[in-house]
Amino acid sequence: MRLAFWLYEGTALHGISRITNSMKGVHTVYHAPQGDDYITATYSMLERTPDFPGLSISVVRGRDLAQGVSRLPGTLQQVAHHYSPDLTVIAPSCSTALLQEDLHQLAAHSGVPEEKLLVYALNPFRVSENEAADGLFFELVKRFAVAQEKTPRPSVNLLGFTSLGFHLRANLTSLRRMLQTLGVSVNVVAPWGAGIEDLRKLPAAWLNIAPYREIGETAAGYLGETFGMPAIHEAPIGVEPTLAWLRSVIEKINAVGVEQGVPPIGMPKLNAFSLDGMSAPSGVPWFARTADMESFSNKRAFVFGDATHTVSIVKFLRDELGMKIIGAGTYMHRHADFVRRELEGYLSGELLVTDKFQDVSKVIEDEMPDLVCGTQMERHSCRKLDVPCMVICPPTHIENHLLGYYPFFGFDGADVIADRVYLSCKLGLEKHLIDFFGDAGLEYEDEASPSESAPHASNGHEDVAGGSTAQSVPSHAATEGDGMSWTDEAENMLKKVPFFVRKKVRKNTENFAREQGETTVTADVFRQAKESLGG
């Protein structure tokens, strides 16, 4: 029944294909019923690349099952002939798991050389997107990475960057720019853009950088245990975390440099990290102290997402913008303990750990924060509630897979996040000004009928900010919910409240009225509630 609703994480196939679709010369064969190739449409729609997804379906049909035959060997032969991949990853589906088919045996009968096949036999019922992706990347690194000499100059591997990653290309560009400024080259980016030969030379780097808790951490751990490679797992999101990240890179690179007999690197002047090479690398420190941003110290924020971005954004909002964090949560059950440790002292209550978007929506409706930082699901929920929302992590939509340069990492990323926070909270004020001062002839009608005013709502829901009626009976919006009615005079007073807090004011006023034993919200009740609630 859960599949009838939105899910924060995709299936195991989604995670597997994110890894293989990122790589060069790697193809996925999914042994599944017809129709499970829907995933190719996701990449074609969202991924801004000229290449077609490297995914084929070995169709499981009832007739074949009745005859005791399988199409998998034939499909593997066709893929080898048509695409000539360096490696074909064979992935099971829920159907093949139920049938208990032996994919290793079927693959062995295909005639394709064993070294060009990898059967990733996970349990598709228990493993979801990120765990499947992280596990497959680990298997690939374990299989192909080989010991070798270090590069003569300082170099790093960037691990965990995958197809459909959040602001993927911009984040990579930001990291490359900062590393180049330090005098550090990039040995391999994996899995994004990497081939099998690139995986072989991973141990040549001096340092692994795996900024995502969800994907890449396991592979970095293996490289550390097997080849003695140090790693950095922190994400450089925000000005202070970026400075700490740069210091960590310098420290670990210089530690390896002592062994290699290479002169140490140092921290350059900060303006060297700016886009023009002359100004401050980020405008956040001074922007946070402007009169405009000082008002944000009273704004309340709620953050929900994956482990990496939830931790980073909570710290950025409180430490660098001075906002109040009223709550945070994650849908990553596997990493909930990590999030709790990182956010100790940042949250007044318990961390919300759930993969049900309805639970998150309920918290937002109860708290009515000034800003929500979440996923595409929270954006939908907030639109219904007229709560400002910005997307900080997957699941996302097309507006988070951009051609332009909008990183979240580094000094540039801090500016992008600050801009989005500011605009998410501030945009929409013109709607309130029209509500408050009148339309000034901007194609709005003062005396619109209820049936005419409903379509004017920005989100497809009836908007109490629309035109008032001449009738004395309360409108549907006035009695929506538990039957509390409002007089026309009280409704008119409510319309003078900014739209982005109007639902919160309505809810608080009705709660006050119930406590006073009132069944109807009048103008007097509204004024009393305002005084009582400190408005």
Curated annotation (Swiss-Prot):
Top enzyme category: oxidoreductase
Keyword Iron on entry: yes
Pfam families: Oxidored_nitro, PCP_red
Residues reported in the UniProt entry to bind [4Fe-4S] cluster: 36
Alphabetical list of InterPro entries matching this protein: ChlB/BchB/BchZ, LI-POR_suB-like_C, Nase/OxRdtase_comp1, P-CP_red_C, Protochl_reductB, Protochlorophyllide_Rdtase
Residues forming the catalytic site: 292
Residues that, per the record, bind substrate: 428-429
Sample GO molecular function, one term: metal ion binding
Assembly, per entry: Protochlorophyllide reductase is composed of three subunits; BchL, BchN and BchB. Forms a heterotetramer of two BchB and two BchN subunits.
Similarity field: Belongs to the ChlB/BchB/BchZ family.
Name of this protein: Light-independent protochlorophyllide reductase subunit B
Species this chain originates from: Chlorobium limicola (strain DSM 245 / NBRC 103803 / 6330)
